[in-house]
Amino acid sequence: ESNGFLPLSACSVSSGEKLYYVNNCKSVFYARIGSGSLENGVRLIVAHVDSPRLDLKQLPLFESSGISYFKTHYYGGLKKYQWTALPLSLHGVIYKADGEKIDICIGEDDDDPVFYITDLMPHIAKDQYDKTLRDAIPGETLNIVNGSVPFDDEKGSVKHNILCLLNEKYGITERDFITAELSATPAQRSRDVGFDRSMIAAYGQDDRICAYPAFTALLDSDDSDKTRIVVFADKEEIGSVGITGMASRSVEFFLRKLCDKTGADYVRCVENSVCLSADVGGAFDPCYADAYEARNSAYIN
């Protein structure tokens, strides 16, 4: 909105307007309305903004051998071994029984605690070394450590102490996890890579590295007779399923809303439209050359 975009519900969809539509708090549509009819077609760029992560289960909190954990299930195509001994942050929302929404972001500020998934020490990992890379870290062991201090005294429960801390800070109970959506992601900020700072290391570049320039291109574009639309889609990492993924009819419904407001024919709009799917590919890595087809790979230089 600081760039002049208004909710679709507040717009007449007239030439020059900049509008947005949020689909179930997960995907977003941005549009700059052109001077021409929508029946002449629109120009779309679609990128996804979800990335591999660890989602907390419905009742994730449990205690084992004096340590409190979150039980997780992984979202998207992640390599499980990359998520152990890595500082993790917690993001998401919790809906309390009274309907209050609580936004959660823990682990991004320097003063925040972080969370970890443990791994075996090298000198006791003989059996682990004998396993394949796929099986060395079972998904069932991706449990996130969240505390180790017992409640009140040494005989108390660590889990109970964690619940007390959560209740004190956020006013939630264990049952509130059922109506929560919480995810763990790497607690690492974006950094330049190399003496020449020519590369960027950051979580979620697939596909936010495409989403960001798509949006800035929309901001920087000149007025046009064509309506330009950028879609930030969800659920790509798990097959674009659900009401916020591209397998849904969300794009159709958005275009129909625009056409209905302007009296344009939806079928003609679609027939004359062009869509660019903006997603990433792996650049050729000489350290793993056998995994690539060298003549048809992207290169950094």
Listing of model-derived features with the role each one plays in the protein:
Residues 1-301:
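N-terminal hydrophobic/helix-forming segments and targeting peptides
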